[in-house]
């Protein structure tokens, strides 16, 4: 017997531990972040947007939630092999779809809406529940990783460039750089408000890890990163198109490696869409490897 319950803030530690157990089951390494979960829950109506499943002993055996607005909604589903019983993923998916359609119906000013979800390449059960419920495979994403197995030297900065950390006056120029360079197939443009929510984490970021590169005063590169328990995480790395292929991206990435190495972190990771083949080939040349693959699913909402 499975019992579904809505979320409360008191569930956060328990849910995080379950997510980590799912990470370990699939990849042998934790990948879930308390800060990310706190940020996500801050944006949710916990009594309506999320659910946990328990067995008769009271153990947490499943988790699902819905987030988003303005026609763009996302669902997270966590099931654990073999702890989560067969069919639990369908119960959680039913709750998520019902709530996502409610949210879409409330957004009367949007022309269309869709629900996005992700499954790892090794989780057949999640892949099946998405596909059985009318989701299409939209694209694939790679987690790129580098592990620090020895000293990491700081690369010499080219004289042409000046380096600084982010300040509030940089916001519009930084957003324009990101949107002008993130133009690969399948990527939807973001409004500045959506980008701000994605990057600044409700104020939970450290400007030390938001590194900007200028040439003659013009912003030509940026690395927007976070220091997490598992290592450095580069959320966005951008180089102006007329500076690509000239070594700036390589230098900036290696600079971030050295920054996180000096913080005694074990490595650095980032995510990249498989359709952005130029980027992930570049990361591999720098010494990163693909540690995980995710399938992005999408489903139109009524």
Which residues does each PLM region occupy?
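A short beta-loop-alpha structural element at the N-terminal edge
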Residues: 2-15, 162-176
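Conserved donor-binding loop and adjoining core beta-sheet/short helix segment
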Residues: 20-103, 119, 215, 219-232, ...
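Conserved GNAT-fold acetyl-CoA-binding loop/helix
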Residues: 20-40, 182-198, 206
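Acyl-donor-binding surface of acyltransferase catalytic domains
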Residues: 67-74, 79-159, 295-299
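Conserved hydrophobic beta-strand within the GNAT/NAT acetyltransferase core sheet
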Residues: 75, 115-117, 234, 268-272
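Conserved acetyl-CoA-binding loop-helix of GNAT-fold acetyltransferases
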Residues: 85-102, 239, 245-262, 281-285
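Conserved active-site tyrosine of GNAT-family acetyltransferases
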Residues: 126-130, 283, 288
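C-terminal "cap" of GNAT-fold acetyltransferases
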Residues: 142-164, 266, 271-277, 287-302
């Amino acid at each position: 017997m499975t019992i579904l319950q809505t979320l409360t803030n008191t569930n956060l530690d328990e849910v995080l531990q379950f997510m980590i157990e799912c990470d370990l089951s699939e990849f042998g390494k934790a990948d879930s972040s308390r800060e990310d979960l706190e940020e996500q829950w801050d944006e949710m109506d916990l009594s309506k947007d999320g659910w946990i499943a328990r067995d008769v002993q009271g153990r947490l055996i499943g988790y699902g939630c819905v987030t988003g607005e303005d026609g763009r909604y996302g669902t997270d589903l966590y099931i654990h092999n073999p702890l989560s019983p067969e069919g639990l993923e369908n119960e959680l998916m039913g709750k998520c779809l019902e709530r996502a359609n409610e949210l879409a119906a409330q957004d009367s000013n949007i022309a269309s809406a869709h629900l996005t979800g992700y499954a790892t390449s090794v989780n057949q059960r999640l892949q099946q529940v998405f596909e059985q419920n009318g989701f299409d495979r939209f694209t694939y994403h790679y987690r790129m990783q580098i592990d620090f197995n020895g000293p990491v030297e700081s690369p010499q900065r080219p004289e042409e460039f000046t380096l600084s950390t982010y300040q509030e006056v940089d916001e519009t120029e930084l957003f324009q750089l990101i949107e002008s360079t993130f133009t690969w197939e399948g990527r939807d443009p973001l409004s500045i408000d959506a980008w701000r929510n994605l990057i600044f984490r409700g104020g939970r970021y450290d400007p030390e890890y938001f590194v900007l590169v200028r040439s003659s005063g013009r912003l030509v590169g940026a690395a927007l990163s976070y220091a997490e328990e598992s290592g450095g995480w580069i959320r966005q790395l951008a180089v102006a198109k007329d500076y690509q292929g000239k070594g700036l991206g390589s230098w900036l990435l290696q600079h971030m490696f050295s920054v996180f190495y000096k913080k005694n972190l074990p490595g650095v990771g980032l995510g990249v869409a498989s359709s952005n083949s130029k980027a992930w080939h570049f990361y591999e040349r720098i010494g990163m490897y693909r540690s995980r693959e995710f399938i992005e699913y999408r489903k139109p909402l009524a």
